[in-house]
């Protein structure tokens, strides 16, 4: 029986010892593991960082940017103090727009609008007795004048362009016919022949009342169309050719004139000399030719 009690006491002691050991293991082992992990993690991370990181190159731009980041706030803190209100308002061309706005803010006025509007608002509220010193050549006035000048120049250029285009169109619409001397002579003969076959009534017409057909004798010379040269003007019978219905007419009496059948010379006089006259001999020859043509027709 004593042996049985001894065995039971040993068994209880061993169970208690086992319980104590298990309790010790359960309480101490996790604490040691956590401490070891905490000690190992920084060492591992530090070694990995050292292995993975590469040496950075020197970048002066990065340093300048960093310096600007540090210096920019310091500059932003330095604010220029507003100028106090002057006793006399300076002219608009001697003060900037920001200064005018600061003065308006000091007086509680609106700062909206152009520079000239802000200036006039400040003058009206703070300096009503002072005479307005508004120079003509302010910035706004210069801009307005420049715009007006630009518009005037544009309008003038447009008118000049349209005028040149009209002149060019007129030049294109004008047809200039240049005929040689033989060609002109043949054309004149053709016209004369066409008139010759017409009746006398068509080769004769009345002279207008206000026309000076017969010329008086004078000293000097006159240009004869048929001869193509200057002849003496002191002879009687010089006539001035008349142009009617697209052809030339020779006065025969003070009331009648007949067609020109003589061929004009292809020679032109000097400038300033009248070239629409017929000498007495040519006037007589033209009259005789008219009679012959009418006789042949009969």
From Swiss-Prot:
One of its GO terms (molecular function) is chromatin binding. The keyword Nucleus applies. Residues 36-61 are annotated as: Disordered. Residues 92-126 form the SAP domain. One of its GO terms (cellular component) is nucleoplasm. Expressed in embryonic stem cells. No expression is seen in 5 months embryo, mesenchymal stem cells, embryonic fibrocytes and adult tissues. The keyword DNA-binding does not apply. It is found in: Nucleus. One of its GO terms (biological process) is system development. Keywords: Nucleus, Transcription, Transcription regulation. Its main location: nucleus. Interacts with DPPA4. Binds to target gene promoters, including NKX2-5 and SYCE1, but not GATA4, and may be involved in the maintenance of the active epigenetic status of these genes. This is Developmental pluripotency-associated protein 2. It comes from Homo sapiens (Human).
């Amino acid at each position: 029986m004593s042996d049985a009690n001894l065995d039971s006491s040993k068994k209880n002691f061993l169970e208690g010892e086992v319980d104590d050991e298990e309790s010790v293991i359960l309480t101490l082992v996790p604490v040691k593991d956590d401490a070891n992990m905490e000690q190992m993690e920084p060492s591992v991370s530090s070694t990995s960082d050292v292995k993975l990181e590469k040496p950075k190159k020197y970048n002066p731009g990065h340093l300048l940017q960093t310096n600007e980041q540090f210096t920019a706030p310091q500059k932003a803190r330095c604010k220029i103090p507003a100028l106090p209100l002057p006793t006399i308002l300076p002219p608009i061309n001697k003060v900037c727009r920001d200064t005018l706005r600061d003065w308006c803010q000091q007086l509680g006025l609106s700062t909206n609008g152009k520079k000239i509007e802000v200036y006039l608002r400040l003058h009206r509220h703070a300096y009503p007795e002072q005479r307005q010193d508004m120079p003509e050549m302010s910035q706004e006035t210069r801009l307005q004048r420049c715009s007006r000048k630009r518009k005037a120049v544009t309008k003038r250029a447009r008118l000049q362009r349209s005028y040149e285009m009209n002149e060019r169109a007129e030049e294109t619409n004008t047809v200039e016919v240049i005929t040689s001397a033989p060609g002109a002579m043949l054309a004149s003969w053709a016209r004369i022949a066409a008139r010759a076959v017409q009746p006398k009534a068509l080769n004769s017409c009345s002279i207008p009342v206000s026309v000076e057909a017969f010329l008086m004798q004078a000293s000097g010379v006159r240009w004869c169309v048929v001869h193509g040269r200057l002849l003496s003007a002191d002879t009687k019978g010089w006539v001035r050719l008349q142009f009617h219905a697209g052809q030339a007419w020779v006065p025969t009496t003070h009331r009648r004139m007949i067609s020109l059948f003589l061929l004009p010379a292809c020679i032109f006089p000097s400038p300033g000399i009248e070239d629409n006259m017929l000498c007495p001999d040519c006037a007589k020859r033209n009259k005789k030719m008219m009679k012959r043509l009418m006789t042949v027709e009969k």
